[in-house]
């Protein structure tokens, strides 16, 4: 947003530790909605997506309740399938520590919409604790656990410190079974956990990675997750070179589009159930060509 250019909010700039990281900037919890509603959106990556900056300053922020209203009026997709909502819960442990229980707030906001639109709500988070809390509150949704390629979930680190189970520990066959037994419906993972530039151990006996051509290799994660009864999603499909593995880059300019078609296709051919893409039109183009 343009908050850094707003002198009336200059004194709100501060430094906080959130999920083990010290961050300096402006934080939503220090603003009222009336104040936030005066801000205007900006392109997050202007050096990469300069064309998008022409929209800077034109549009206000959208609240969740406003988005729910838009979805209630949205026409079905061309396939006839109603548009679904994926709500990602961020930094739940941190917000709970400052008296903002996101499970309570989200359940109050989402429950009426979810009840009126069955089967259209997906809730995801990097912290399993808040997913369980929302389940206990009876929010009807598909629950998806987000997993990074490294590190450990913030809720478990807050509870167990260095003994916290890592994301990798959740992705073992036993870990996937535990997630399903806990009521998790699916996992959503970094693309690098599904496809990447072929590592040295590709195709070796016992390796989780197998060559798929083009200098890329795919893991066995989708098959193992499906065997455990979990859906599989990945994030984020982007066409620019800086976001592509080396075999799919074209030229040396990070902002230029590389061989995104091969990259998107390689991910989709793993058999996963859905993708998150910054350019949905490009993702649909690749899906149609499979």
Residue ranges and their predicted role:
Residues 96, 137, 142-290:
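C-terminal active-site rim and adjoining tail of enzyme catalytic domains
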């Amino acid at each position: 947003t343009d908050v850094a250019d707003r002198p009336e909010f200059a004194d709100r700039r501060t430094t906080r530790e959130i999920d083990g990281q010290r961050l300096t900037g402006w934080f939503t919890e220090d603003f009222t909605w009336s104040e936030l509603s005066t801000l205007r959106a900006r392109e997050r990556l202007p050096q990469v997506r300069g064309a998008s900056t022409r929209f800077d300053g034109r549009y206000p922020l959208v609240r969740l309740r406003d988005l729910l209203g838009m979805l209630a009026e949205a026409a079905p997709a061309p396939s006839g399938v109603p548009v679904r909502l994926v709500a990602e819960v961020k930094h739940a442990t941190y917000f709970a520590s400052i008296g903002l229980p996101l499970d309570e707030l989200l359940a109050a906001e989402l429950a009426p919409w979810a009840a009126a639109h069955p089967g259209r709500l997906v809730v995801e988070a990097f912290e399993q604790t808040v997913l369980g809390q929302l389940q206990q509150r009876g929010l009807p949704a598909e629950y998806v656990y987000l997993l990074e390629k490294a590190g450990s979930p913030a809720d478990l680190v807050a509870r167990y410190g260095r003994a916290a189970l890592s994301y990798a520990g959740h992705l073992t066959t036993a870990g996937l079974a535990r997630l399903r037994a806990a009521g998790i419906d699916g996992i959503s993972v970094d693309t690098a956990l599904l496809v990447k530039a072929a590592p040295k151990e590709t195709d070796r006996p016992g390796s989780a990675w197998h060559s798929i051509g083009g200098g890329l290799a795919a893991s066995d994660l989708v098959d193992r997750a499906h065997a455990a009864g979990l859906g599989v999603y990945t994030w984020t499909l982007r066409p620019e070179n800086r976001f592509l593995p080396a075999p799919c880059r074209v030229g040396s300019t990070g902002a230029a589009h590389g061989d995104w078609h091969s990259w998107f296709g390689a991910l989709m051919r793993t058999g996963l159930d859905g993708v998150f893409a910054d350019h949905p039109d490009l993702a649909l183009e690749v899906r149609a060509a499979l």
